[in-house]
Amino acid sequence: MNMNIFSGALPARNIRSPRNTDMLFFFVFIAITAFNLWKVPYGTITNDESLYLAIPYRFMQGDSILFHEWNPSQMSALLLLPPVKLYYTLVPSGEGIYLAFRYLYICFHSLTSIYMYIYIIRSTDELPGSYPAALTASAVYLIYSYSNIMALSYNSMSIGLMVLVCLTMRSLSGELWKLIFVGIAFSGAVLCCPYLVLCYMAFSFAVFFRLVLHRRIPKGEDLLAHAFSLKSWAVITGVCFCLASAFCIFAFVGKDISLLKEIIPRIMYNNEHPQRTFVELIKGLYGTFYRNNSFFKPVLLSSIVLCAVITADKKRCLHRALYLIAASSITLLYSATYLLMYRETNVMLLPFSILGFFAYLLCEKKDVKSFVLIYIPGAILCFCFYLSSNMGVGAISGVSAVSMIASIIFVFRLLGEMRAQFCHKKSFARYFSIFSGIISLSVILILFGGITYTRALKCFREDGVSGLTERVTCGSAKGLKTTPEKAADFELKYSELSPLREIGNGNVLYFSNEIWRYLEDPKRCASSSMWLSTGGTEQNLQTLSLQEKYWELFPEKFPDYVYIRADLAKDPVFMAAWGKYEYTLTDSDNCVILCMNK
């Protein structure tokens, strides 16, 4: 690799020229993509992955968004509706759909990584360290997978779309097509996480604030002139408005909108997502970090102290190596709990943002555009996911991939500045700066290694890759590799559904958390949500009560058939609650099927 990549400004170049960094990226990209393709079949379908395809399948059958489905993540299903419909057109049985959509995820993820590499270089080419920053950020993003689930979910799609939005805004020079692209991508991200409207509000405020103060900004120093111009706001807002109008037409035309008064509260707040006050949200934000990381309090206090010292030090440029070592130590301390105990991909991304923030403070010529257009939107995305998810720190850290990009840019820019500062000096300061650079790069390497290790040896809700030796041979999970026991269990349950599946018409309610069953059945879903909360007697009765309210609003959705798991059917209190209905009962070892008499 050309060692001059850490030095100052570089001349403009053709992005397709076969430079050393491009060749290195090509080999890294091929290696990681090959790894991802190898990993694709491993792991059976879980409730989470089942849900991602079950909701668009429901809409494909004709059910209405926001009316017939009450899951809060349902709007992201609109993005998957076209490919799901295409797949069922080509494969009417839906066989192997989960494996196919894992490959589709790899395509989206890989293309986003290439886009990231190209646009980091294009938009930061004048900055020190832009080439290794582009290579490192794209490699970390490519190896990473949200919760180690290789699926197109509202999580992975919102991350990928926000990456595209932020990088395009960072490279903006007033091009109309880029603004249209940003509007489309951001609209898709909002479908995945509606709380991202907060990001649009922050953008609108920034545009207004700049319009008020633009006369006070010296000419040539308005670095955010294109991103926060009135033109940018108008085009992006116009695109979002057009797409929002199309969504409203799709969702509400021909529907009884008055029903939304009953439905929206049930979508927003349920047993898994209870309503919280603003004070509870802030306390919960602190608590979710404190409970999940034994080092959080010392890390927080150390970070505040270090931030204050750096800000107060007017000669910080001479002491940057020392501060960088301190920041690297804080990052490692925060990462220790996750690296040694949890070993989940989600929690290993946020530490990049800690190191990146301090690197930004230490840069003499700060990359304001990357901080405002990548790092801050990434932080807003984390907060939005905290609001919408019940996963706590896992959700917050899992979507910090956007801030990770800016953080890596800041670290390599800082290293480039420090190299330029001491490259002609043979002194202790020079060797100490080299040592600090090695420490910070080691932190990045350790985190990258932790993500790679977890991705290689673990699968979501599985014990480990080594035990996944059996391929599923039938149904929607065909082609996936899991344990022999789970493969046999899936195939047994699939075969038991044959009599019910062959009855093509009617509505069916699967009172089970095995959402994949809906994709095996051509009948319409009779449930208020594809995701049903099942468990003890009280929870099951609450879920049944919710279904009854759903059937009151939509009598046409009352089930013709009800599938109840065998363990739930053994609960006499729960089964007695069905006594108000007339039905014919058929039972087997694994389930009870109620044929309802309407």
What does each model-identified segment do?
Residues L53-Y57, H68-L99, Y103, A189:
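Short hydrophobic/aromatic helix or loop-helix immediately within or flanking a transmembrane segment
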Residues C166, K178-P194, Y200-F205, G378-S389:
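Membrane-interface alpha helices of multi-pass inner-membrane proteins
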Residues N4-S7, S171, F186, C199-A244, ...:
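Perimembrane helix-loop-helix junctions
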Residues N71, L447-T534, D560-L568:
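Short periplasmic/luminal acceptor-recognition loop of GT-C membrane glycosyltransferases, typified by
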Residues S147-S158:
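Short acidic/glycine- and proline-prone juxtamembrane loop motifs at membrane-interface regions
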Residues P128, M162-I180, I217, F358-K369:
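Membrane-interface transmembrane helices that cradle and orient dolichyl/undecaprenyl
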